[in-house]
């Protein structure tokens, strides 16, 4: 901000001239994933009334509050998420009545992952999961093994190990920060996608095509890319809406896929593998897959009813081990405006107002996103205004510090 003042530039305008944009490389050479929208956040903040009217508001406030200084602060950060060896298991299963069961290696530590993963099923299955289980460590339906260090192994070691169809660079990531919103959701949604494509969609075609002359589907061209859920009913190109209960019952009757266990691995890009499913080969963004087929498949060679069969991958495509050397690829940006007043007599700082803008990707739960923002703001206020950690030998690293010496911000101070 001081530099912007010397250049006679709006401080946000100076940031816009230096912001990382879509397609640019980071400092280590990696190109961030997708659209990098930090510049959009800067422009939104630049147009906010707190920023636009800051000079007028300062003049008015200081005129009516003698002895107090007024100011507007702004900051924008881009934070990466992920470790370069993210992995998880997810199991999704649909009962003949249409109830969705979800099991996951992820652990709920206050991030809301138990809610987000249930909601993640809606995209493919039309309803959230209601039978939930997390922090699962035993996965007999999809036995996988690991060896070596996913960060330090050589490319030749990975190439040799991946010949084993049960091998993966890492089994399951610990829960941390907000990794559930992206990494955990990936395996959940991949499992749901497989169930939809090889279970619910064939069931829908069978129901729409029943009746004389091919039923209601015959006069139309019905493609999977036209499928969508509306008010809990599946439709496509004008077809009658079908409930999940109808589709599940039919999928079980036909012997379609009604359950899937998926394992995924991410080294700044997702591992992919080819799996034989029925008479087709599917390339999935996963390195492990097990399927459960409906009762109609009990007598077939394709599956055993009520049990899972691990599908041996034909080919696997792991990100090169050198991918970690290029740094991270997943970023999220957040900008905050803060309206402050300072008592010139005693230095007391009062936060009058604040406004934050975040680019969080596809929202799973607005309430959870809001909660994450509020928690981050409370932490930031606490660190900036109430945290005092002296340097050197008397600092908090000497082993004598606890909450008797560290000021723990109270709700009244950060709300």
Regions found by a protein language model. Name each.
Residues 1-68, 75, 79, 120-415:
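C-terminal catalytic domains of large/alpha subunits in multi-subunit enzymes
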Residues 71-96, 104, 330:
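Conserved beta-alpha junction segments in alpha/beta enzyme cores
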Residues 92-101, 361-364, 373:
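Short, hydrophobic/aliphatic alpha-helical segments
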Residues 99-104, 351-353:
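Short, aliphatic-rich beta-strand segments
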Residues 107:
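Glycine-rich NAD(P) Rossmann-fold beta1-alpha1 loop
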